[in-house]
Amino acid sequence: MKFQSIAAVILGLLGSGCSTLVSKVFPLDDLPVPSGPHAVGTQYFEWVDGARQEPFTEDPKDKRRLAGQIWYPAGVSDDSLRQPYLDYPERRLDMISYQSGLPRFMVAHMQRVQTNSMLNAPLLPHSQKRPLVLFSHGLSGMKNQNTIQAELLASHGITVISVDHAYDAYLTIFADGTVADYRSSDTENRTGDAFWAFRLPQLKTRVADLVFVLDE
């Protein structure tokens, strides 16, 4: 009975359409400040692998296109360069709402969450040979989902590269406005050999994505 009462209160808040109340009940703060001694810089990138056909589309002329993000130890700290957690928030919030099954106004305050990453901040001097971590998100994930960990590593002198595996990510948005939607969900009704016949090519595509990024 107590759970039903709590649920009724939550539903009442949802029904009110009051985003301010929702942000209080379901708070989302700025990302925690990383513990390392260095500031954190970030850059976005887009690459096209001209040697690979895009396996998720039917047009044989489509080449594999990737969007990603890099975090690295920066030489300066400037709060005016801090990036929001969500790029293209208006488009991403629609998809987050759809995937989570929550009304859009319940997730709208995600667009106000700030990271500690400074866009195009200069690289920390003498950091060209620091360790590198390559991050690969899960099915329907996104390149920046583990920004907290990426910033933590970068603040300790480690460079992190993450890529949206196009069509495996929940939504990839390119700088020209085109998108790659999620197309990897057709595994639920497959078992045994049928499952792996469908999934293995996708996994090979992911591995090829990472190899391509490292080569770049």
Question: Language-model features: where?
Answer:
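Bacterial N-terminal signal peptides that target proteins for export
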Residues: 1-6
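C-terminal motif of bacterial Sec signal peptides marking the signal peptidase cleavage site
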Residues: 16-17
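Domain-level recognition of soluble alpha/beta enzyme cores
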Residues: 21-133
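Divalent metal-coordination and catalytic microenvironments
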Residues: 70, 153, 210
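Short aromatic-enriched loop/helix-cap "lid" or pocket-rim segments at secondary-structure transitions
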Residues: 81-83, 172-176
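Short substrate-entry loop that stabilizes the transition state in hydrolases
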Residues: 116, 122-130, 135, 139-173
